[in-house]
């Protein structure tokens, strides 16, 4: 069964968010320190990255369970976007998380 355009776009947004969150955490937050490495914030970024990767994986294998992973991904991405905005200096992460959350929310519906 072929993927819909919406699913293909969602997979792309999930992978982009995965790359952005993980890359920002490892190359920006760890180097910047301070509130960027607060355990709650850093764990949230790691959870967000991994959930995005997992949601993309579930869509790629075309399991109907992707609705569950996409729902959780939307929730975590929304929380991560808000926390990255709170910490500051992470506009790329905020944008990637919001785009992914919106797309995953639609896939979960």
What are the residue ranges of the model-derived segments?
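Amphipathic alpha-helical hairpins
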Residues: 1-109
């Amino acid at each position: 069964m072929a993927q819909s355009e919406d699913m293909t776009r969602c997979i792309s947004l999930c992978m982009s968010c995965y790359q952005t969150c993980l890359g920002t955490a490892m190359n920006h937050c760890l180097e910047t320190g301070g509130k960027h490495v607060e355990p709650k914030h850093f764990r949230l970024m790691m959870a967000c990255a991994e959930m995005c990767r997992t949601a993309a994986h579930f869509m790629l294998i075309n399991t109907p369970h992707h609705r569950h992973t996409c729902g959780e991904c939307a929730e975590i991405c929304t929380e991560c976007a808000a926390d990255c905005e709170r910490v500051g200096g992470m506009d790329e992460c905020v944008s990637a998380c919001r785009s992914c959350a919106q797309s995953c929310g639609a896939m979960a519906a």
